[in-house]
Amino acid sequence: MYEYIRGQFQGISKDYVVIELNNIGYKIFTSGNTMSNMPKVGEEVLLYLEQIVREDFIGLYGFTTREELEMFKLLLSINGVGAKAALSLLSISTVNNLKYAIMMGDEKHITRAPGIGKKTAQRIILELKDKLKPDELTSEEGELIEGINDNSDYSFNINETLSALMALGYTEKEAQKALEKVDKTLSIENMIKESLKLLMR
């Protein structure tokens, strides 16, 4: 079992990042939040890990904070919520805002995550509401729940940008290379524009 990995950030894709350690590139699935916190290519980064092993799959999932890792594991404990859904939930806002939404029973916020329907949102609230502690959140963090911008879904924006660039005739590798140099907090439209500037040089 892995605790964490410290290595060089080498790239980003639709739902994972690549970390190089001892000349080996590790494919690590992650959330939009963690993707947005990646350094420049070649710089060092530390990710806290969880390994998932199934009959047909072995994967590493990593996050820049222990808090996000623990929330990921908590979401996986819910029947019907897999790794993909958990990452989707962790991509729509900060961990604290997700916790706040669960404690407040805010189904609308939770169903913003791609792949999460009303029934799943209700199950998440029912099973986790009593496990989360209100004193873990400040009032300021709680207030943020009303002002979350759609652009906080980093992984969704990255996917859409990559798809748009590939639709324009660029290869996935070319699109990814350009996107690595673009600010991930921009809107999809602006990420496409900035990526095209790099690709047309």
Swiss-Prot record:
Record region (Domain II): 65-143
- Which GO terms label this protein's molecular function in UniProt? ATP binding; four-way junction DNA binding; four-way junction helicase activity
Q: Name one Pfam family in it.
A: RuvA_C
State the compartments where it is located. Answer: Cytoplasm
Entries under InterPro entries matching the protein: DNA_helicase_Holl-junc_RuvA_I (IPR013849), Hlx-hairpin-Hlx_DNA-bd_motif (IPR003583), NA-bd_OB-fold (IPR012340), RuvA (IPR000085), RuvA_2-like (IPR010994), RuvA_C (IPR011114), RuvA_C_sf (IPR036267)
Q: Which GO terms describe its biological process?
A: DNA recombination; DNA repair
Region annotated Domain I, chain positions: 1-64
GO CC field: cytoplasm; Holliday junction helicase complex; Holliday junction resolvase complex
Q: Where is this region: Flexible linker?
A: 144-152
Start and end residues of each stretch annotated as Domain III: 153-201
Q: What is its main location?
A: cytoplasm
Q: Which UniProt keywords apply?
A: Cytoplasm, DNA damage, DNA recombination, DNA repair, DNA-binding
Reply yes or no: does the keyword Transit peptide apply.
no
The UniProt entry, under NCBIfam families, shows: ruvA
Entry similarity comment? Belongs to the RuvA family.
Relate the assembly described in the record. Homotetramer. Forms an RuvA(8)-RuvB(12)-Holliday junction (HJ) complex. HJ DNA is sandwiched between 2 RuvA tetramers; dsDNA enters through RuvA and exits via RuvB. An RuvB hexamer assembles on each DNA strand where it exits the tetramer. Each RuvB hexamer is contacted by two RuvA subunits (via domain III) on 2 adjacent RuvB subunits; this complex drives branch migration. In the full resolvosome a probable DNA-RuvA(4)-RuvB(12)-RuvC(2) complex forms which resolves the HJ.
Purpose: The RuvA-RuvB-RuvC complex processes Holliday junction (HJ) DNA during genetic recombination and DNA repair, while the RuvA-RuvB complex plays an important role in the rescue of blocked DNA replication forks via replication fork reversal (RFR). RuvA specifically binds to HJ cruciform DNA, conferring on it an open structure. The RuvB hexamer acts as an ATP-dependent pump, pulling dsDNA into and through the RuvAB complex. HJ branch migration allows RuvC to scan DNA until it finds its consensus sequence, where it cleaves and resolves the cruciform DNA.
Notes on the domains: Has three domains with a flexible linker between the domains II and III and assumes an 'L' shape. Domain III is highly mobile and contacts RuvB.
Q: What is this protein called?
A: Holliday junction branch migration complex subunit RuvA
Q: Which organism is it from?
A: Clostridium perfringens (strain ATCC 13124 / DSM 756 / JCM 1290 / NCIMB 6125 / NCTC 8237 / Type A)
Provide the gene name from the record. ruvA
